[in-house]
């Protein structure tokens, strides 16, 4: 404890920050008990006065600053000006948008200042003000929304909506504002939900990787350490040296840079005072001890860790610093933003510092200042400084102010210009490694506000062809694209026009007409108009009717079934229903016929003379020539059960009704054949027939599996009486012959087809053809128990000739003589739709249709059915006809409403064809009221055709060509622009995760491998070739793909510096520095990079985390190396080993003269590191349990129970805090022979542990 200081008397207004400082001061000087008392007293004081003060919020407390009206008016004037410049074509769409966003951002900022001033100056005791400024509730940005304005919001895609919410919650929002406002609110909610999940998982991984880091030693006596300086981003201080030193231990003596006096000897602990003293002395960097360089075994020592931040003293032995580190990094995770808003334009506060004139005066540039003209992002003309120099502002009364201009700064004034106070005259570009502007390419569409014709004024289109051969038009430089107003008619496909350019059209006159033409011709059927006023015309190309057959309808199970009865009594089942379409070759009906039904499954054989062809679409075989089908019945049971359930033997003769397999009975008598595989019974076949035993195989006089005709002697004494199929079988009684019965089914050559009459249009014919199909081929075995149908007779639609691709419609037609009888008719229709007449709308004129045919008329192919005319909405002159190939697609009429008549006196300064902007002079005192093109200029009047100029920036993609006709809202061009990315694209949690998981960043920068001088060559296709001429004369080329450079030609670069923008890849840093400066340096540089990067993310969100927490995690990530070559050691190539372990083994090798192991450092992400820890219990409880345990079992691993997690899992006391000593004592009790030495000299405790519980009890007794 420091000597007791004098109590301080603090008498001032105190806010949240001040309160924190007060408590912290009390704590470090007076300890816990007295601080607690102080806090208690403060609480009572606070409550007492809060109760008396009765601070509450009423609507009256929400005071809107008076300056709001003026601020909004100014902003709206600026925006109005930008809109006017945009309409005149002086700035592009992007520049307008940027200007709007920046103006509103500025206004919001100014208003926030106004709110602050209003509360602090005019009304310091306002409840809302007191709450916000004291830090009790709310903050300035929330108060701004209550009494200032809500400001700009982003849409769900993250683009800023250029309509700000001007109202605040005190005034209330209107409907539009309310909806825009809800966008942002919803995003906030969704983000928070995602954040908590992400951050929880991050914490879990961190705890797992660091849970075994415990302070186990007093001092590891290492001479190494890390250099701490202040962490800055450009000119902005992120963490000061003083802040970083507190709670650290000096790694070597700290010496005053001027006097040489030792400010702090080695191993000094820095407290607030000594840290402040060192920072004041001007020391740039101090070497401190750090967990990163601690040489304690698998832990850290007290000196390297430094203070335990909980009580500002050196950390105690046995403290679980790993878990503390993990929680310190994980907990603020929720406060980090998930993703950056992708904000179209980013406020430039980040990358440029605006300079405003403090007084009126005249600008002077120094001679060194070199600047070139350029266009700002608001479309103003300005200069950009190429070389540094100074610029001074000289006031009339001798005042003078000089500023240093950095390269890349914007100068908004000219040399010698006079400016007024408050004018912004420059934007200084910040210099510094981290202040680099990273930009990305983005596109913005330009839509036309009016319909009309495109005219390129000074645009020079340039065509680029990519590798696929697609051509794209680009604007080669800044230029104007005009849209000259007119009425554009979109013509439907196939429309023809007789108009020519310059032709006149009256209102209601015909612009174009389309014709409806029949392709095949035939009989006409006119349908009634439908609800929408359209009509269908059907043309019957061909039809066929079954004139003698009657259609019967039956209903079953709620569905209709149709059958067809012919005059000779055959019945066909219809396979189609009325109103459906049938294609060529499709089956229309199938005969209902049981002559070809079998009683069971069996074998099918074709007799001589049957000829078949494969039918369409896997539908069996079509009979070409008739004959007889031979059918050998057999009964097949598919079983698929265990063989033990079989009740009969292979080859046994069974009677009908016998159980062959459990619960399966045969329906016929016959010989059993069994198919089995792997003791699974597949099927049981029963083959009926006469069974005769054979004495010798030679007795069989007929070939096996052939037919025996009636009267054939099969074996001596057996003669067949009818046709049989002969099979030789093995029975339990011996060899036998089975004579199987054969059924014969005759097949006619041609099936009966019902009579039909057809009406055909020349060239296409249609009929129904009878067809016989056999589903099986010769020799097929049909597995079935019930019967099957061997032959199907079908009616098939046949369409011949050119109409084969058409489909026929099914119709049921009442008979002419007897309407109660219904006949089947198939027709081929050509259906033509006649559109209803439409009134004119924005894109089309009105249409009028005439039908030119009558119902029932017969017409030839190519006849015109109807004609549709497109009529003009207004009278006008044809000015443009846009064609695609030969067909006209759009027609432009210029009507009276597109022209402006301007009476003018005096001499005209314009001639026909000139393009004017609104406000340009027509004659001396006469300005044009509209932008456009002069059509007529005669004495006394000028006629201007209204137009609208659009400024297109160089490099923009043009989507129209000169002379195109476009409708309103068509896309004219894509402006390509670069927008600044705020800091880094990935911010917040995802970035922390990316760093800690050691992932390669998406758009990573290119790093310099060896120091040297940069040479940049520009290629013809605008890309760069960067090479570094190294100090030893070697040259390395670096490929740059689509990234912007951050170095300039001739710049000297060091190892590991970045050439392009974007985040670095930590693996590259490790590789480059290891190759250049050795293992230790490589590991150190990547450790430094990771610690600083993680700190930057947290600091940018205003979260303070001490470096040492991040260092512990990074230490765990970099503690392993990969063995490349094991040398004479026991290590295997590719193995991941602790660096310490390899160093110790290599020291031993140096003594014995063996070859040392060779290794490269690896950076493991936290997940990988957790899974690679020595403790398999810890790794298995984290992820991939099965894999970890299986591998541990195969390798025969032991778990040394060093960490907390392993011990918790198996239910022992954890080796931290008071449990730490139990270990030390436990190890002393054990006899030497029970110790097993491990390579690291860490002792494992065998099972003969002197009972953990005893120690706990002994301690209790003390």
From Swiss-Prot:
Keyword Nucleotidyltransferase attributed: yes
User: How does the cofactor attach, per the note?
Assistant: Binds 1 Zn(2+) ion per subunit.
How this chain assembles, per its entry, is:
In cyanobacteria the RNAP catalytic core is composed of 2 alpha, 1 beta, 1 beta', 1 gamma and 1 omega subunit. When a sigma factor is associated with the core the holoenzyme is formed, which can initiate transcription.
This protein's source sits in the domain of life called Bacteria
What residues bind Zn(2+), as annotated? 220, 294, 301, 304
Reaction catalysis annotation? RNA(n) + a ribonucleoside 5'-triphosphate = RNA(n+1) + diphosphate
Q: What keywords are annotated for this sequence in UniProt?
A: DNA-directed RNA polymerase, Metal-binding, Nucleotidyltransferase, Transcription, Transferase, Zinc
User: What protein name does the entry list?
Assistant: DNA-directed RNA polymerase subunit beta'
């Amino acid at each position: 404890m420091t000597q007791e200081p004098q109590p301080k008397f603090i008498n001032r207004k105190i806010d949240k920050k001040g309160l924190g400082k007060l408590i912290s001061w009390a704590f470090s000087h007076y300890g816990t008990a007295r601080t607690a008392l102080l806090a208690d007293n403060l609480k009572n004081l606070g409550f007492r006065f809060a109760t008396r003060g009765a601070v509450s919020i009423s609507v009256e407390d929400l005071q809107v600053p008076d300056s709001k009206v003026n601020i909004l008016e100014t902003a709206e004037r600026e925006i109005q000006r930008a809109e006017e410049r945009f309409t005149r074509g002086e700035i592009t769409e992007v520049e307008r948008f940027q200007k709007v966003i920046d103006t509103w951002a500025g206004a919001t900022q100014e208003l926030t200042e106004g709110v602050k001033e209003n509360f602090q100056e005019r009304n310091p005791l306002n409840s809302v003000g007191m709450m916000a400024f004291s830090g009790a509730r709310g903050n300035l940005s929330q108060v701004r929304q209550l009494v200032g304005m809500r400001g700009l919001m982003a849409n769900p895609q993250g683009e800023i909506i250029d309509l700000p919410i001007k109202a605040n919650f005190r005034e209330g929002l209107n409907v539009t504002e309310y909806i825009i406002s809800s966008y942002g609110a919803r995003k906030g909610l969704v983000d928070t939900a995602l954040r908590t999940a992400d951050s929880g998982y991050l914490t879990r991984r961190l705890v797992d990787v660091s849970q075994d880091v415990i302070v186990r030693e007093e001092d590891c006596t290492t001479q190494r350490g890390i250099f701490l300086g202040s962490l800055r981003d450009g000119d902005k201080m992120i963490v000061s040296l003083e802040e970083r030193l507190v709670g650290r231990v000096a790694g070597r003596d700290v010496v005053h840079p001027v006097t040489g006096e030792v400010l702090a000897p080695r191993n000094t602990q820095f407290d607030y005072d000594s840290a402040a003293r060192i920072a004041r002395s001007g020391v740039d960097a101090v070497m401190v001890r750090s967990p990163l360089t601690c040489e304690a075994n698998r832990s850290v020592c007290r000196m390297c860790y430094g203070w335990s931040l909980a009580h500002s003293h050196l950390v105690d032995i046995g403290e679980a610093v790993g878990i503390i580190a993990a929680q310190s990094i994980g907990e603020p995770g929720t406060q980090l933003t998930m993703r950056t808003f992708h904000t179209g334009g980013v406020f430039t506060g980040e990358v440029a510092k605006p300079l405003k004139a403090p007084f009126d005066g005249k600008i002077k540039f120094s001679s060194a200042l070199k600047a070139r003209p350029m266009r700002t992002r608001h479309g103003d003309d300005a200069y950009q400084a190429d070389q540094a120099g100074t610029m001074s502002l000289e006031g009339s009364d001798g005042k003078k102010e000089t500023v240093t201009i950095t390269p890349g700064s914007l100068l908004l004034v000219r040399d010698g210009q006079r400016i007024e106070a408050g004018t912004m005259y420059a934007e200084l570009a910040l210099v510094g490694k981290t202040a680099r502007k990273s930009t990305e390419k983005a596109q913005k569409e330009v839509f036309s506000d009016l319909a009309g014709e495109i005219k390129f004024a000074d645009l020079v289109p340039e065509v680029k062809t990519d590798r696929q051969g697609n051509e794209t038009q680009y604007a080669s430089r800044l230029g104007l694209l005009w849209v000259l107003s007119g009425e554009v008619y979109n013509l439907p496909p196939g429309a023809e026009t007789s108009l020519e350019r310059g032709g006149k059209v009256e209102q209601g006159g015909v612009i174009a007409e389309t014709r409806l033409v029949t392709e095949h011709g035939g009989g006409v059927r006119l349908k009634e108009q439908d609800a929408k006023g359209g009509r269908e015309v059907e043309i019957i190309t061909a039809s066929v009717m079954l004139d003698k057959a009657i259609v019967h309808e039956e209903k079953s199970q709620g569905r209709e079934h149709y059958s067809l009865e012919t005059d000779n009594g055959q019945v066909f089942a219809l396979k189609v229903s009325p109103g459906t379409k049938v294609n060529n070759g499709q089956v229309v009906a199938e005969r209902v016929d049981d002559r070809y039904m079998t009683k069971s499954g069996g074998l099918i054989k074709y007799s001589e003379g049957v000829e078949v062809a494969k039918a369409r679409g896997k539908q069996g075989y079509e009979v070409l020539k008739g004959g007889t089908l031979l059918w050998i019945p057999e009964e097949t049971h598919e079983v698929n059960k265990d063989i033990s359930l079989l009740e009969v033997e292979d080859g046994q003769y069974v009677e009908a009704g016998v159980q062959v397999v459990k619960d399966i009975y045969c329906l016929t008598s016959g010989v059993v054949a069994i198919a089995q595989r792997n003791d699974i019974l597949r099927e049981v076949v029963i083959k009926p027939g006469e069974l005769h035993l054979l004495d010798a195989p030679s007795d069989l006089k007929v070939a096996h599996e052939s037919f025996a005709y009636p009267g054939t002697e099969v074996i001596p004494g057996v003669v067949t009486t009818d046709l049989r199929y002969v099979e030789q079988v093995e029975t339990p009684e011996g060899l036998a012959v089975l004579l199987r019965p054969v059924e014969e089914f005759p097949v006619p050559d041609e099936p009966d087809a019902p009579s039909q009459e057809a009406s055909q249009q020349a060239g296409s014919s249609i009929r129904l053809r009878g067809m016989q199909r056999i589903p099986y081929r010769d020799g097929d075995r049909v597995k079935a128990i019930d019967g099957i149908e061997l032959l199907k007779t079908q009616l098939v639609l046949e369409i011949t000739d050119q109409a084969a691709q058409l489909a026929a419609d099914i119709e049921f037609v009442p008979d002419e003589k007897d309407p109660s009888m219904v006949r089947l008719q198939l027709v081929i229709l050509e259906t033509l739709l006649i559109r209803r007449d439409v009134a004119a709308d924005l894109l089309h004129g009105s249409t009028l249709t005439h039908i030119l045919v009558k119902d029932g008329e017969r017409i030839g192919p190519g006849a015109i059915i109807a004609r549709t005319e497109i009529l003009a909405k207004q009278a006008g002159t044809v000015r443009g006809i846009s064609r695609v190939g030969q067909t006209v697609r759009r027609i432009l009429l210029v009507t009276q409403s597109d022209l402006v008549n301007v009476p003018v006196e005096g001499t005209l300064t314009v001639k026909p064809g000139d393009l004017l902007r609104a406000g340009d002079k027509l004659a001396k005192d006469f300005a044009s009221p509209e932008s456009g093109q002069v059509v007529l200029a005669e004495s006394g009047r000028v006629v201007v055709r209204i137009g609208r100029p659009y400024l297109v920036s160089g490099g923009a993609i043009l989507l129209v060509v000169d002379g195109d006709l476009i409708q309103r809202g068509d896309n004219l061009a894509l402006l390509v622009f670069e927008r600044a990315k705020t800091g880094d694209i990935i911010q917040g949690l995802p970035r922390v995760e990316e760093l800690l998981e050691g992932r390669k960043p998406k758009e990573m920068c290119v790093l310099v491998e060896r120091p040297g001088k940069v040479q940049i060559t520009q290629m013809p296709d605008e890309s760069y070739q960067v090479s570094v001429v190294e100090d030893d004369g070697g040259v390395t080329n670096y490929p740059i793909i689509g990234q912007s450079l951050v170095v300039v030609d001739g710049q000297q670069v060091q190892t590991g510096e970045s050439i392009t923008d974007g985040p670095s890849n930590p693996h590259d840093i490790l590789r480059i520095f290891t190759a250049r400066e050795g293992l230790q340096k490589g590991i150190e540089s990547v450790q430094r990079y990771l610690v600083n990067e993680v700190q930057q993310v947290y600091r940018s969100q205003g979260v303070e985390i001490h470096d040492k927490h991040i260092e512990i995690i990074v230490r765990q990530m970099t503690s392993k190396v990969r063995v490349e070559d094991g040398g004479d050691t026991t290590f295997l190539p590719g193995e991941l080993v602790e660096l310490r372990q390899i160093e110790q083994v290599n020291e031993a090798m140096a003594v014995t003269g063996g070859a040392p192991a060779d290794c490269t450092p690896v950076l493991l992400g936290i997940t990988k590191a957790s899974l690679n820890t020595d403790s398999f219990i810890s790794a298995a409880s984290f992820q991939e349990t099965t894999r970890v345990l299986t591998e541990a079992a195969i390798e025969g691993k032991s778990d040394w129970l060093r960490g907390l997690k392993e011990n918790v899992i198996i239910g022992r006391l954890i080796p931290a805090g008071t449990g730490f000593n139990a270990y030390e004592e436990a190890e002393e009790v054990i006899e030497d022979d029970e110790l097993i030495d491990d390579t690291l000299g860490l002792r494992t405790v065998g099972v003969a542990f002197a009972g953990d519980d005893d120690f706990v009890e002994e301690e209790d007794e003390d």
